[in-house]
Amino acid sequence: MQENKQPSEIQGELPQPPDGESVPPQPTNEQAPPDTDTMPRIEETLRQLELKAAEHHDAWLRARAETENVRRRAQEDIAKASKFAAEKFAAAMLPVKDSLEAALTIEKQTLESLREGVELTLKQLNAAFQNGGLTEEDPAGQKFDPNKHQAISAIEAEGEPNTVLNVLQKGYLLHGRVIRPAMVMVSKAKGT
């Protein structure tokens, strides 16, 4: 009769082969025989992942093409904006040109009517400038600013040095940016 062995002792013992025979190794979890259902499942999973990868690649290509189209359209818009930036201003200049041409067609003008015509044309021109964001810089009596003024000469004068005494030619700003500095005469301290 066999002795009653403890479960821990039973687990550690392997069955012994009869004398002279060898026992083939028992499969363990690491050496499990291939499951016949596993390969088709792996192939199906691989096929699904390949489809998803193809979808993602296609979406990436579409996004890349769309980005390129947006970039190209933006460049075209910038080129058009640059090309036609002066369109509004040019349209505002046309009535001024028309007025000047009309004045030249009148053969017998009085000095007074010519003056009135020039004043009206100047008003049209000033309105066009104002609508286009072009403003005059007339700095008489102001402190000299080298960013907005160009000093033609300096004259000894009473008062604060570097003050604009006389404006020889007005300056112009386009939306606050100097496009032509005012040509000015400035004061300097006596004896310098």
UniProtKB/Swiss-Prot annotation:
GO terms for molecular function: adenyl-nucleotide exchange factor activity; protein homodimerization activity; protein-folding chaperone binding; unfolded protein binding. It is found in: Cytoplasm. The keyword Protease does not apply. The keyword Chaperone applies. SUPFAM superfamilies: Coiled-coil domain of nucleotide exchange factor GrpE, Head domain of nucleotide exchange factor GrpE. GO terms for biological process: protein folding. Residues 1-43 are annotated as: Disordered. Participates actively in the response to hyperosmotic and heat shock by preventing the aggregation of stress-denatured proteins, in association with DnaK and GrpE. It is the nucleotide exchange factor for DnaK and may function as a thermosensor. Unfolded proteins bind initially to DnaJ; upon interaction with the DnaJ-bound protein, DnaK hydrolyzes its bound ATP, resulting in the formation of a stable complex. GrpE releases ADP from DnaK; ATP binding to DnaK triggers the release of the substrate protein, thus completing the reaction cycle. Homodimer. This is Protein GrpE. It comes from Aromatoleum aromaticum (strain DSM 19018 / LMG 30748 / EbN1) (Azoarcus sp. (strain EbN1)). The gene is grpE.
